């Protein structure tokens, strides 16, 4: 069976007595300054993420209730998925990094990776729906116009699909003491300790799942979004090229440009930030290295 370690502090593969795919803790433990910086970074992300996302949700659903539209509701959904990661994943990762072993039980071991995968899916599919709405509004203004009701139905479908797509993560993670069995440390510090690891029947099964996940959760959605915004940019340039423009139309074009710039920035940031994580999940071996 292939087993890979979901451990925040990367370690090299042990070569003692077997071909275990776990990590050897002695040779790759991060130095204290690096560990401190990592924990500070996680803490800042946790605080800013919680405060920023919750504030945005409150503004959209409380202060701007009458001005709600398809895009604002989907942006609130993005914030909700990010808040879920802050609540369910980040602080567990901080403690796991500091302690080098898992203390939160089997259920939380499964849930943290599951929730993170669900959050990625919810975020990317929310961006897909937003791109569709912008496309219809700008490129095909006389066609179908997504409404607030459509947004809520879309969010329901997004969450259902994301929850189903991420089930293999919940099923594959478990607790084991194997990474600690062959340590040559002169201490019993890791005796009876366990790590939260990913366990697949075979490399082929893992490769099939991670490749499918990469396509469904990252490559195909971002490609679709890119095509939508490319057509939007082309359409806006053509409209700007027209000489006969009314001032109100010009103002509307500027507003669309502002919104599109913001949404494109969100997409680019999402793609850049999640690419390392997606790539590591989709690697052939699935094993983290130094």
Curated annotation (Swiss-Prot):
Q: Which UniProt keywords apply?
A: Disulfide bond, G-protein coupled receptor, Glycoprotein, Membrane, Receptor, Transducer, Transmembrane, Transmembrane helix
Instruction: Spell out which residues lie on the membrane's Extracellular side.
Output: 1-39, 105-111, 172-206, 280-290
Pfam assignment, any one: 7tm_1
Q: Which InterPro entries match?
A: GPCR_Rhodpsn, GPCR_Rhodpsn_7TM, NeuroY6_rcpt, NPY_rcpt
Q: Does the keyword Transmembrane apply?
A: yes
Identify a single GO molecular function assigned to this protein.
neuropeptide binding
- Where is the major localization of this protein? membrane
Domain of life from the UniProt record: Eukaryota
Sequence intervals crossing the membrane: 40-60, 84-104, 112-132, 151-171, 207-227, 259-279
Record membrane topology: Multi-pass membrane protein
What SUPFAM superfamilies does this protein map onto? Family A G protein-coupled receptor-like
Where are glycans found on this sequence?
A: 11
Which cysteine pairs are covalently linked by disulfides here? 109-196
* Tissue-wise expression: Expressed in heart, skeletal muscle, gastrointestinal tissues, spleen, brain and adrenal glands.
Kindly indicate whether the keyword Hydrolase belongs to this entry: no
Q: Where in the cell is it found?
A: Membrane
- Name the protein family: Belongs to the G-protein coupled receptor 1 family.
**Described purpose of this protein according to its UniProt entry:** When expressed, is unable to bind pancreatic polypeptide (PP), neuropeptide Y (NPY), or peptide YY (PYY), suggesting that either it is functionally inactive or that it may have acquired a pancreatic polypeptide-independent function.
Name of the molecule in the record: Putative neuropeptide Y receptor type 6
- Organism source for this protein? Homo sapiens
């Amino acid at each position: 069976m292939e087993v890979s370690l979901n451990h925040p502090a990367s370690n090299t593969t042990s070569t003692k007595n077997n071909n275990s795919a776990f990590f050897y803790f002695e040779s790759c433990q991060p130095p204290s300054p690096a560990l401190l910086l990592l924990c500070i970074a996680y803490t800042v992300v946790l605080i800013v993420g919680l405060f920023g996302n919750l504030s945005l949700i409150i503004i959209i659903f409380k202060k701007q209730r009458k001005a709600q539209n398809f895009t604002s509701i989907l942006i609130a959904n993005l914030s909700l998925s990010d808040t879920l990661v802050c609540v369910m994943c980040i602080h567990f990762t901080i403690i796991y990094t500091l302690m080098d072993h898992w203390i939160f039980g089997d259920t939380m071991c499964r849930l943290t990776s599951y929730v993170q995968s669900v959050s990625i899916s919810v975020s990317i599919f929310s961006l897909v729906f937003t791109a569709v709405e912008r496309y219809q509004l700008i490129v095909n203004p006389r066609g179908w116009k997504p409404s607030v009701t459509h947004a809520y139905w879309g969010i329901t479908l997004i969450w259902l699909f994301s929850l189903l797509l991420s089930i293999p993560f919940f099923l594959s993670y478990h607790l084991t003491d194997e990474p600690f069995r062959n340590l040559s440390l002169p201490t019993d510090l890791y005796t009876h300790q366990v790590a939260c690891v990913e366990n697949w029947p075979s490399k082929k099964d893992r490769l099939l799942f991670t490749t499918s996940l990469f396509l469904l959760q990252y490559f195909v959605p971002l490609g679709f979004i890119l095509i939508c915004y490319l057509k939007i940019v082309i359409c806006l340039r053509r409209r700007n090229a027209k000489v006969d423009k009314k001032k109100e139309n010009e103002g509307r074009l500027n507003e669309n440009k502002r919104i599109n710039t913001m949404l494109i920035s969100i997409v680019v940031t999402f793609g850049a930030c999640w690419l390392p994580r997606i790539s590591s999940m989709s690697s052939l071996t699935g094993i983290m290295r130094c």
